[in-house]
Amino acid sequence: MTTQLDSLRNMTVVVADTGDIDAIKKYQPQDATTNPSLILSASALPQYAPLIDEAVAYAKAQSNDKAQQLIDAEDKLAVNIGLEILKIVPGRISTEVDARLSYNTQATVEKARKLIALYNAAGISNDRILIKIASTWQGIRAAEILEKEGINCNLTLLFSEAQARACAEAGVYLISPFVGRILDWYKANSDKKEYAPAEDPGVISVTKIYNYYKEYGYNTVVMGASFRNVGEITELAGCDRLTIAPALLKELQENSTALIRKLEYKGEVKAKPQPLTEAEFYWQHNSDAMAVEKLAEGIRKFAIDQEKLETMLSAKL
């Protein structure tokens, strides 16, 4: 029996959106993505206790300053979890930069270099790592610098066409346009509470971005993210990559209904437009209330979970 997950793998690279090693072993994705919230969840699992202890010991060996120890322990824990995941997935791990640096280009670049150095010291080459950065103007500029250094980036919390366009123009390796969080916003801010998959505003957004990239010949990978239901996933079959939480991977694995490719660009490739200026980026992005609110909210939520992680680690330092 061919499952929907098998069918999806034939047209899209399937990525696991989790830090849970057991789930990754079960569904055998090509890549895996983590974020501060997923690192926090994973840290509560008993099998991760040794990784936390090792990160704390590492931090204590680096510095006597408590504040610096906390930063070092956070970074090392994220990398330790990434290293465990890389033992299972054949492809890449996405590890996220502290969301509180989202509006600071230089600090983002420095944090990314540090994370890469930790991976490199553990014997992992750059081609197995993606550095996750929020798709702010400052984050996109940081990614532009990092890509030129051979550090590939995954630009996340992407909700607007302006963000997608700026990422492609900066030569970013991969973007993660969010689907479910866009749906959440429309449900909360309009009278319409139910959407068929094909009319789901998150699905429509990713479809537009995918077609725009193919139409203008951008090489940036489109990886749909943040799914609320299987319908959103099947409607985006054919997207370059999709990062999917274990519960939805399970549903896809248990369903054998035929899957039809929905995304495939067959038109001609056009000449690329002039890159957006900073002013144009802000005007276009800020014209979309959903994108403005969801980007800010996403950064706040990741920062809150980063602080919870710090509380847990500081008790051990």
Swiss-Prot record:
GO terms for molecular function: transaldolase activity. GO terms for cellular component: cytosol. The active site is at K132. It catalyses: D-sedoheptulose 7-phosphate + D-glyceraldehyde 3-phosphate = D-erythrose 4-phosphate + beta-D-fructose 6-phosphate. Pfam families: TAL_FSA. PROSITE patterns: TRANSALDOLASE_1, TRANSALDOLASE_2. Its main location: cytoplasm. GO terms for biological process: carbohydrate metabolic process; pentose-phosphate shunt. Belongs to the transaldolase family. Type 1 subfamily. Transaldolase is important for the balance of metabolites in the pentose-phosphate pathway. This is Transaldolase. The gene is tal.
